[in-house]
Design a protein with these regions (language model features):
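Extracytoplasmic small-molecule ligand-binding "clamshell" domains
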Residues: 15-80
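An extracytoplasmic/periplasmic, membrane-proximal ligand-sensing/linker region
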Residues: 19, 27-38, 222-223, 230-287
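A bilobed periplasmic-binding-protein/Venus flytrap-type ligand-binding module shared by bacterial periplasmic
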Residues: 25, 105-117, 217-231
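A conserved helix-loop-strand patch within extracytoplasmic ligand-binding domains
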Residues: 97-153
Length: 287
């Protein structure tokens, strides 16, 4: 009886532990809520713990929430992931999609801009004087790497119309703004572009693909370093394996992978993002 009384307070404490997952808000909220709601259910079933998806208002909030310990597992872009990891000692990169080692951005334009597709990076200079939109200010594929490729050919943010670019906040928003003509051109996640094109959400009479960038590493999962202490020895490895084991042969897992636009998840490590860190420092996004 004494043993039962001694252990009784422990069980509720363990049961109260919730794995809090989140992600940068890079696409429309409805799509993200569906994706991470499904993923939370899948992880909860596999791990045997409650899993809650907590949406954030912007990219910076994802980094801040992770740094403060309010979020346990976050789907970051390349830049935000590096920022979050450097600000959170002990945190660990655990996975990326099969497409993330060689990711890419696209530059698009409204047909009325007069801009035409090109294969030479030097032709990015044609964007000077145009109304141009990036995505989020902290987006890797929607801002950091496009700005890097622009800088390589001598195009700075001050070269755009009104001496500054616009920031749409997400890839879907950039596409919508360029398609509507509010901006003459913009840059966004290449995979989002390809997906929306396939889904029939791009009006090719209004929008043209100008250029695809060279590849770079991008999105990845980062976990807090204290998960084994909170959920039990080996939990972080079990969490990683749960992500790596997602397969199209299971209906719910297939939907999750499709929403991630991935064939599967693969292992990743911090060194995979060394180039992103270097570019981030060169453009003043990491200090």
């Amino acid at each position: 009886m004494a043993l039962v009384l001694l252990l009784a307070p422990v069980a509720p404490a363990l049961a109260s532990q919730v794995l809090r997952i989140s992600a940068i808000p890079d696409q429309n909220p409805e799509r993200l809520n569906r994706l991470y709601g499904l993923l939370a259910s899948e992880l909860s079933d596999q791990l045997g713990v409650p899993v809650k998806y907590t949406p954030v208002v912007d990219y910076g909030a994802a980094v801040t929430g992770f740094r403060r310990g309010d979020l346990d597992l976050v789907w970051f872009g390349g830049l935000t992931g590096v920022q979050a990891r450097l600000q959170t000692p002990g945190s660990k990169v655990i996975a990326q999609r099969d497409v993330d080692a060689k990711f890419w951005s696209v530059f698009i334009a409204n047909q009325s801009s007069g801009l035409k597709p090109f294969s030479d990076q030097q032709d990015l200079q044609q964007l000077k004087g145009k109304r141009f939109a990036f995505g989020s200010e902290s987006s890797t594929s929607g801002r950091l790497m496009p700005q890097y490729f622009l800088a390589q050919v001598g195009v700075t943010p001050a070269d755009f119309a009104s001496n500054r670019p616009g920031f749409s906040g997400s890839h879907d928003a950039t596409l919508a703004l360029v398609q509507s003509g509010a901006y003459q051109a913009g840059a966004l996640n290449g995979q989002v572009w390809d997906s929306r094109l396939k889904e029939g959400k791009v009006d090719t009479k209004k929008v043209v693909l100008l250029w695809r960038t060279p590849p770079y590493a991008d999105y990845h999962w980062i976990a807090q370093g204290n998960l084994d202490q909170r959920f039990g020895l080996g939990f972080t490895n079990k969490l990683q394996q749960s992500l790596l084991s997602l397969t199209p042969s299971q209906p719910r897992q297939k939907t999750i992978l499709e929403l991630f636009a991935a064939g599967r998840f693969i292992p990743a490590q911090a060194s995979d993002y060394a180039n992103i860190e270097a570019v981030g420092r060169s453009l003043g996004k990491i200090r």
